[in-house]
Amino acid sequence: MTVPKKHSVSLLVTDVDNTLFDWLAMWHTAFSGMMAEIVRISGIPQSELEPEVRRIHQRHGSVEYSFLIEEMPSLIAPGMTVKEVRARYDPAVEVYRSARLALLKPYPGVIDTLEAVRKRGCRIVAYTESLRYHTTERFKQLGFDGLIDYFYSPGDFALPSDRADLPARRAEAQASLAYTIHRTTPPGEMKPNPRLLLDLIRETGGDPARTVA
């Protein structure tokens, strides 16, 4: 895409993960800590757990699948209910959450740059392959709500059928952004994708000739 002159730019399209914040460091640190705690609680070597983890991540198409632990066969003892599995490994989940919150910060200069772009009258669209729930939660903590006009992402994975509390919690989280508008990308779409990029530019009222992406 041709980069227009600075004075004519009306739309900025940006990636999110590892562009606006260090997703890899956050996820790797949080996930490694969680796995270490799972090993401690279960007594099962990590090398035996990792193949199960990979299969579950592949099945759900995300390394941030929230219900990983309760689907790992090695962690479900005979006669153990899913609720009991959750309770036993809740300390591991807390390790993950604590590390994620501690590390989730914008790269230096990101907030100032987004604010400067908006002051020039330029709209900002973010496009990520991370799922909607996780991205919404991150936008709130990172301070992106209101700085970014739209964010495009896939939807969310299916919720466990035994968790009647989760649909309301997910709906609350999805509606919790005060200003930024979410739009869902079609299933299976991956980056780079020039056609999808053009679609989201047009959907947000942009002009490809006046867009930086």
Predicted regions and their residues:
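Substrate-recognition "cap/lid" segment bordering the active-site pocket of phosphatases
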Residues: V125, L131-V212
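Pocket-edge positions in alpha/beta enzyme catalytic cores
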Residues: H57, S98, A102, T185-E189
